[in-house]
Amino acid sequence: MTEKVTKFQSPVPIVLKLRDLIFGKEKPDLFTKINFLLNLVLWAIFMIWSLFSFYTLEARNFIYRQKGIPVETIIKNRGRELGFEGEDFLQRLLTVNGISIICWGVVFLSLVLMYRRSKRFYYLFLVPIVFYIGLLFIYVSPSYFFEDTTTFDKLALIIMLTSASIYYYLIKNKEKDEEINFFGIETDEDGA
């Protein structure tokens, strides 16, 4: 005979309760789901890349011993090309990647608020992304931002900021019980 699995023996109820705790029990509309999923995928790419970059920089000696890849030499050479001296470029990359992990963690919290259709998501979303871009541009260097940051990264950041701004605009107007009108022109349907 098979034993019946109780809720205390199965991990599924715990996972479902955790999901409900994080995302809430109410399902959002289709536009919110699409916007959330788009930003979640882009968030995951940036978070994974930041984690890998940080690990690679921290484990550069281990990588050299195991694989013979001179990560530190490669980074120092690129730093010299960008005008940095000695360990400065490496330390700045470590700092940027460490802080970017924190920034992307805050962005995930904002995505949870987006899924719950809270207007507060926008500020938690906007501040760390703008801070991240500022770190790359100001703390490392403008030439690093333009030459070493990929076009994909730049486009992904623009897509994230644009989609979040549009979504914020739409939920702000929805809370005011106004019709969504991007151009601000009243039409016959709007009561003109």
Model-predicted regions and their roles:
Residues 2-192:
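Topology signature of small-to-medium multi-pass alpha-helical membrane proteins
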